[in-house]
Amino acid sequence: MSVSRVSAGAVAITAAAVVGLSGAAPAVAGEQWGINGTFATSSNGEWARINDRYENQPSTRSTWTISTQCISPTECSGTVNSDAGWNAPIYTTNGLWYVKRVVPNWRFCADGTPVEGMQIYKIYPVGFDGHVDLASTEYTGEDVTTGPSGSCGRNQWPAVRMPFYMRPA
């Protein structure tokens, strides 16, 4: 095969690739990887565990307005505004979404001393069958609030875990 035929073939392949790619949309940070909108949330106190022992707790319901920005499917961050009067950062790590906030006066000791809690929501998109579904707009996970070890004279972190669910409002 002559050099001119090889060169002509290479030019034809390059031209076809350029024409084929010219119609493709470039990947941008505007992809719908994040969580944005208004959501109804619920933490189910009927299935709460206090220090890994089931104990009925008050359930909580609220409405969250979430705004996130992403630079990739695994790197997003933003803000959650709750109608309960708080706001907190939201971000992704290893496929899970995290919302972390400090809860002042979370619990009170027998002597009336207030205990601050760290509330962490860990959520992921879930399909109708209960499995992870990245295209879903519904989320499930866990609502965990933990107090400091040694609070109220006990050498143990008080921790309350509740199932969590979130869907578009």
Predicted feature residues:
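Predominantly extracellular/secreted and cell-surface proteins with exposed
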Residues: 57-126
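Edge beta-strand at a domain terminus
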Residues: 140-169
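Generic short beta-strand segments
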Residues: 40-48, 83-84, 100-107, 140-149
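Internal, hydrophobic beta-strand segments that form the core of beta-sheet-rich folds
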Residues: 117-150
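Extended lipid/amphipathic-ligand handling interfaces
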Residues: 66-67, 127-132, 165-169
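Secretory targeting and sorting signals
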Residues: 1-29
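Flexible, membrane-facing loop/turn or short amphipathic-helix motifs
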Residues: 46-54, 107-114, 147-157
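Tryptophan-anchored aromatic micro-motifs
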Residues: 31-55, 139-143, 166-168
